[in-house]
Amino acid sequence: MGNSQTKETRPSHSQSSRRSHQWGSGSSHGRSPYGDRHNSEGSRSHRSSRPDLSILGLGGSSDRDVATILEHRRETKQEREARRLEKERAARIKERERSMREEHVDGGYLVTQGVYTGTEDFNKAIVRQLMIERRLAPFWRGLNDFSDSWTEHQLMAAARGLPIPPPDEIPPELEYRNPPKVVEEAKEASNIQSVQHLMVPITSRSASNGSDVSHSSQPAHSLPSPSSPIASGTSSSPLFRSRAKTLASLTTSRHNSQVDSTPQEIQLPRDPFVNGQPIEAYLYKDAIECPICFLYYPPYLNRTRCCDQPICSECFVQIKRPDPHPPEHADSDSNAPNPAGETERQDVQDIQLVSEPAACPFCVQPEFGVAYVPPPFRRGLAYASDSSGRPNIGTPVSSTSSLSSATTPTTGRRRATSLSATDPSVITTDKVRPDWAQKLANARAHAARRSAAATALHTAAYLMNSNGSGGDTRGFSMRRGVMRRNNGGQDSPGTPGRSGSPALQAFAFLTDRRAPSGQETDSAEEGTSNLAPPRNSSRRSRMDDLEEMMMMEAIRLSLASEEERRKREEKELRKEAKRREKEAKKAEKMARKAGLYSNNASSSALESPSDSRLPKVTSSSSSIIGEERTPPGKGKAVERVTPSQSNVDLTETASSGDVPSSFLEPQQPQSSSSLGPPVPKEPSKPSHLRHVSSASSSFSSLVESMSEEPGLSAQPHEGTSSSAEPLFNFRSLAAVIGDEDKSDEAAEHVEDTAPHTTSEGSTSSAANLTTAPAGESAVSTSSTAVEKGPTVEESQECSVNKEIETRSMEVTDSRNSETTS
């Protein structure tokens, strides 16, 4: 039984689904761009449910359609908005072309003529209604040029945007025929007769029907009689219909009543002539110039309510209120001190954004508005409700100048008095843009959000700068307590080691804001002293969340900027320290180099020739100053240095003082006669020094035996000429010992280097007395300068040799003193 019910319900379900798809496609046609596609997909899915068709490739079209739908749904919001704006622009262009082709008001248009290319942000519906009511001038076509001598067909060509023909040539498209006066009188009589026979006043009858009758070539008796059903239907049925609508509007909703209250637009008689002239020629024969856009329009322009200046409708709809801004008086005294605080003053200014009414562009009178006096005829669109309070506009009388009796006559005189902004005939800029209040409210809300962000920045700045100052001065007792708890109880000003305190304080501030109100409402004073006490109102919860989120973001940005600034300062400090360290090293190096130069200068001063009367320099001074060059010279003396010490002795000789020439003058003949000329071009080598090791050791033992006498070492080194004789004997002994040990010519090189060591021990040099050429001395100097410094063992041996030389010098001095005595 259940199966039979299932079998019975299945077909009905499929049929109902098909019917629902059909109904849905029929009802949703034209409303949703995706409705047809969804319905077609539903039907396709029913058709392609068979698996065998999907195997053959005939099915699966629904999958492709679903993929196409998903692709359409993936478009971004910006793309949808751009597509919507493009569609709206195309629709506006099409509607504008249609309106200019089919609609007009007294020869003017209901859409702009392209004088201004900006955004049309005025309310187009309100402007259209005001133009149809003849309270605002229509958008006349402006002429770039105008001449009073133009003929009618030239005026028609200029008004229609065609090239202006010559005065004596009428183009075929501008030819017209004046309506015969007989036909006009017949139409007038027929309309008067029809009006007299009508028993019910014409209230809401469509004027298009009457215009068709008036413009038809049928005689007056062709009109239906009032007793005919057509006439009764046209005259009485609208009346009963309006009563029914009135009764129905009392019981219907507000929306229906608003729709019914909108006045109905009617088409007035289509008559292209006014007083026998084409309507274009009648309008533009006395054209005037708009003082703002400098185009020529018919004389029926808007007039300012204050100074009675003409202004076209396109210029009028461009004038609007200024954007919301703070009051001007607040800008003047913005520098004045505000005891309430800078943040509160800024909040008050942001909340008090104002937008003054537009001022007159001519006399700068506020509450700018215009008044419009329409032409004495009526053409185009009108409202059906206007016929009750005005003369019958459906009659041909409206096409004549007799209608001007019901309106204010247009004269050349200007209005002597200004009209009030609340006058019913005055149209202000606020009426054209009634959304100015909403824009002001939006601007104030935006300013409030910006003020909240500024407050967050100020709060973050205060929290970051409050490390060095106490929190009790500004009433942040509870905030400071929370910060102290987060910072480990360190709340004393100037506490070191609080690098993360700004972030902790900021988040402590936010945590304190989110805390329940019971923690902060214990004391009224504490509650009023808080910067931003928590608000628990459910109505403003979203605003509070937004404000706190903005505050957290502002604090994060502020902390990031502060961290970046601190890193930059540390980097600058490190660079400065490196620069100072480099300068200090450079100065130390320069000082070291200057000290070395001073030592060289002192040594060169010692090497200069001295007077023979000066005392001799002791050997202790020569052991302190290092030598840098080997002075050239000859002499016969015993080599007292080992092969490893030869280079050191050669370099130390230059620092010792030069010996006066009187000491060695007697020695030169004997030295030159006892030994052959030396070869100074070859530098002294350790191989040459090995030959004099026995002589050095024997002479050292001799000197040690002689130095045991205590009286000799204590004698002063004095005497000038008498010291030459013992030095003579000493050099002769050294030469004899050297001759015994030498076996080849290499001994000459050793003897050549012996005077340098002798002069080092005795602090006297034979550099100034040698007969060697300058080239040889230069070679010896260059060879000595290349040698390296001695090792530790060589320096010790050198010091021992210097002591031996000193004792030998003392022995010679003592012998010299004994011989003289």
Curated annotation (Swiss-Prot):
Keywords, comma-separated and alphabetical: Cytoplasm
Biased-composition ranges, Low complexity, are 22-32, 224-238, 395-411, 478-489, 598-612, 660-676, 693-709
For this protein, the record's CDD domains field holds:
SIP5-like
Name the source organism: Emericella nidulans (strain FGSC A4 / ATCC 38163 / CBS 112.46 / NRRL 194 / M139)
Name of the protein in question: Protein sip5
- Point to the regions of Basic and acidic residues compositional bias: 34-44, 323-332, 562-591, 626-639, 744-754, 800-821
* Transmembrane annotation, as ranges: none
Where is there biased composition of kind Polar residues? 205-220, 248-265, 518-531, 642-659, 755-771
Q: Does the keyword ATP-binding apply?
A: no
Listed InterPro entries: Sip5/DA2
Would the keyword Cytoplasm be found if you checked this record's keyword annotation?
yes
Compartments it resides in:
Cytoplasm
Q: Where is this region: Disordered?
A: 1-61, 205-272, 323-347, 384-422, 466-502, 514-541, 562-726, 739-821
Known function: May negatively regulate the snf1 kinase.
Q: Name one GO cellular component term.
A: cytoplasm
Can you tell me which family this protein belongs to?
A: Belongs to the SIP5 family.
UniProt superkingdom:
Eukaryota
Q: In the UniProt record, what gene is named as encoding this protein?
A: sip5
